[in-house]
């Protein structure tokens, strides 16, 4: 009986550890992420960041994106990270893609979090219906998620 209880407790601890290790999926290839969003009928969250130099971006990551609340909430959307680092190397393809998206939406500051509803048109092109944007919100994940949820409720 003790062996059975011990085995059960070990299995429970291992499964709890694996659950806590689940990470949020951040896409960096915009086209692939948009296809996933359309296929799964989900909205998209673009995160414009300077991951290695922007203090507010790092603070947003720490206080919101690295929390269990955000991990749970993030299943509602497809996450895309558009990074503009100063010391981390990126491929030219990623740099060009990120700059194109930044110019397309007129993003001028970091962090910027932009929500869109992607729509595949009859000609195969994808229209990105802008729902709204935010950035760092003081008050932690609860306050930030309240702002994000209010933006996601908007429809075009």
Please annotate each region the language model reported.
Residues 63, 100-156:
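Non-catalytic, surface beta->alpha helical segment in thiol-disulfide oxidoreductase systems
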Residues 51-54, 84-89, 108, 120-122:
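Solvent-exposed loop/turn segments at secondary-structure junctions
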Residues 21-40, 149-156:
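N-terminal leader/targeting and pre-domain segments
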Residues 45, 54-58, 113:
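The canonical Cys-X-X-Cys-His
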Residues 1-22:
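Bacterial Sec-dependent N-terminal signal peptides
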Residues 24-27, 49, 70-96:
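Thiol-based oxidoreductase modules, predominantly thioredoxin-like and allied folds used
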Residues 56-73:
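Typically the conserved alpha-helix immediately C-terminal to a functionally engaged Cys/Sec
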Residues 40-52:
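Short active-site neighborhood of thiol/selenol oxidoreductases, capturing the structured segment around
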